[in-house]
Amino acid sequence: MARKKVQRKLDGWKSKEWYNIEAPAYLNRVIVGTTMAGDPSLLVGRNVETTVGELTNDMTKNNTKVILRVNNVVGDIATTDLMGHELTTDYVRSIVKRQTSRIDANVDVRTKDGFVIRVKPTCFTIKRARSSQMQAIREMMVDIVKKRASETDFETFMQEAILGRLSAAIYRQAKFIYPLRRVEIRKTQVEAMPAAAPAAPAAA
């Protein structure tokens, strides 16, 4: 009986194929991992986690997780959509200092091409700020993020959010309300895609 169970497991593995998981074209189609499946359609909808460090070959950026979702399988390539990013908990903790203020915001924005994204920017001040200053900075963060999303398409907005250009834009303006030590886009999450958004084609 035990031999039959082992044989069935071996036969199951033999019937499965390996698939490369590929990042979207605007993330340079980097292969972020491999997986096995007996039926490639079962891969569609599966979330895959990687890091900016792996996507850019810069290990100093491993504190930023990137979430991809398989949208199609062509041959042995599973293509993906970018679904968001998040800073690691350890990294965020390392930024927090005593006698300073942390200012969080949570805002849903719509890009020029119709993607709805939840964005969570965070400011860290040099010293402890007053509640009125914190509120003013929070409102400015929300305004900047909304405006930038409305001006750009999904790919541009997400690249700016993940690679630091959006946080730099917030820093440049909000520092005049109260001195800031750092600004981060702590998390993004795709809430809705436009109905006409096509699945990414596999690389030739």
Swiss-Prot record:
GO terms for molecular function: structural constituent of ribosome. The keyword Ribosomal protein applies. PROSITE patterns: RIBOSOMAL_S3AE (PS01191). Keywords: Ribonucleoprotein, Ribosomal protein. One of its GO terms (cellular component) is ribosome. One of its GO terms (biological process) is translation. InterPro entries: Ribosomal_eS1, Ribosomal_eS1_arc, Ribosomal_eS1_CS. Belongs to the eukaryotic ribosomal protein eS1 family. This is Small ribosomal subunit protein eS1. It comes from Methanosarcina mazei (strain ATCC BAA-159 / DSM 3647 / Goe1 / Go1 / JCM 11833 / OCM 88). The gene is rps3ae.
